[in-house]
């Protein structure tokens, strides 16, 4: 009897962008909408059989991704670079495949990754802004000193046992993490905290940011912060930062099959003017413009794209 022939398959890697607001995280879950399930469903409609999508990391409910990486094995003759367009025509508008490419059969989105980089964004203007609300923690209660947060981050560089920032429920057998880079910087009304590591514990970044905000506001001293995580006092890390401010920026590989422009944080961004900038502009126009009646001048809001410096 002739041997049963199986259809050859090719491994395809994807760079994925998604808005986490209406997802219950990355990983497929029963009775909950997830990113993995949406993409697998789209793949199965095209291929006609079950497909497993392997992601580089599992983001929590409400967390965004600018450049998540995943792979799947495809049968048929569809060119790997065509999968991005094919999937985008079938996916909901809160998921975008930025690129697709062929990779070797032993390439794995999770196990070949050497780093993951996250950015947490805090919006510090006292007035709410609906355009930034879904992507930031509106923290205006107390002034934040980003230099204190930066100072608190530096001792974390290197390999450490970070059990203090480990939420219950993780399947990971240890709490060792190699923090490769960490920084805090301000851009107008926004404070950004970026952390890159070989991997992250369950809930680590949000627990860490929740504590760093206490350092930046002066509620917690630098020494107390360092002692807390070095002594693994998990019971004192009580509150996590809101999920909406967290974004998976990029995943690092020794050999990456995509061009650099797939990374979202290398692109110019449109920055909305702050309330202070609008008030200053209105004041200047009032001083320089004469009006024939008593009507108040309307400030001109510029929509010029402002390049945001690349932080690596």
PLM feature spans:
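Structured-RNA-binding interfaces characteristic of tRNA pseudouridine synthases
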Residues: 2-293, 297-312
């Amino acid at each position: 009897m002739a041997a049963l022939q199986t259809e050859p398959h090719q491994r395809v890697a994807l760079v994925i962008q998604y808005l986490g607001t209406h997802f219950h995280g990355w990983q497929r879950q029963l009775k909950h909408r997830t990113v993995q399930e949406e993409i697998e469903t789209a793949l199965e409609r095209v291929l006609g059989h079950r497909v497993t999508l392997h992601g580089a990391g599992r983001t929590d409910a409400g967390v965004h991704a600018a450049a998540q990486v995943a792979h799947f094995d495809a049968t048929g003759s569809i060119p790997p670079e065509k999968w991005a367009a094919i999937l985008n025509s079938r996916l909901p508008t809160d998921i975008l495949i930025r690129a697709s490419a062929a990779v070797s059969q032993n390439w794995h989105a999770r196990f070949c990754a050497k780093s993951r980089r996250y950015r947490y964004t805090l919006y510090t203007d006292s007035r709410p802004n609906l355009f930034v609300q879904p992507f930031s923690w509106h923290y205006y209660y107390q002034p934040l000193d980003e230099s204190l947060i930066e100072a608190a981050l530096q001792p974390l560089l290197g390999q450490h046992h970070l059990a203090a920032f480990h939420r219950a429920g993780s399947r990971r057998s240890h709490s060792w993490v190699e923090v490769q880079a960490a920084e805090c910087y301000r851009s107008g009304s926004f404070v950004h905290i970026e952390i890159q590591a070989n991997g992250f514990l369950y809930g680590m970044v949000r627990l860490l940011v929740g504590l760093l905000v206490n350092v930046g506001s002066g509620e917690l001293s630098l020494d107390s912060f360092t002692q807390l995580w070095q002594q693994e006092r998990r019971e004192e890390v009580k509150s996590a930062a809101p999920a909406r401010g967290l974004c998976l920026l990029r995943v690092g590989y020794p050999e990456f099959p995509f061009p650099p422009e797939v990374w979202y944080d290398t692109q110019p961004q449109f920055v909305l003017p702050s309330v202070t900038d609008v008030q200053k502009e209105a004041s200047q126009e009032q001083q320089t413009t004469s009006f024939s009646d008593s009507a108040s001048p309307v400030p001109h809001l510029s929509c010029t794209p402002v390049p945001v410096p690349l932080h690596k």
